[in-house]
């Protein structure tokens, strides 16, 4: 069955009207998070909203500064969700931690995603077993190419453009594949999840939330948001962080209260 995590048993149960799911992409070692995206499904307003938290976001753990992508390694899901809650004031109902290769398997299972790649992408990192070679333009991304696209990092604007690109890809994936005609694939996808994904989503949850498939009749139903903040210059430790502080925290919490069921007043 699916690898459950008992430490997260105190997570809030999803309501009938909406829920928040945290998508976590881990690196090849499975230690740090490579991507963090909150997906809010509003069944009442028939909307799906996505919010990405940049992996370089600075957080404090036991009085020390870290990038949020280290939380998974430092204190597991519990610490990661705690830090996301500190930044956003939202409850996470579901989580799915995805290792490299898993997204590709799901994309292949669904027959690829039609996508317009914005630029030529070339990158290689043998340590991560990551080799990217994509051409600009409209194409069908199979699983391998979808993985390459979502893991590409050499943007001029760095992580911000990367999170926007990941959102854009997931928007295309949801629009094209969250469709009743792909409902027959649910068992296959669930099998992949059982093998490769750490999650608290059960088959019962999937069936309970099947109405989500009806939401995605048009692209206007999917909205993407960025976490407000800015990059600082290199600190004394030689690390550059993305800062969500002071007015940006208030801005983010206000955004989350408005669109992600957050509790900030």
List the model feature ranges, each with a label.
Residues 1-265:
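Non-catalytic, solvent-exposed segments at the cell envelope interface
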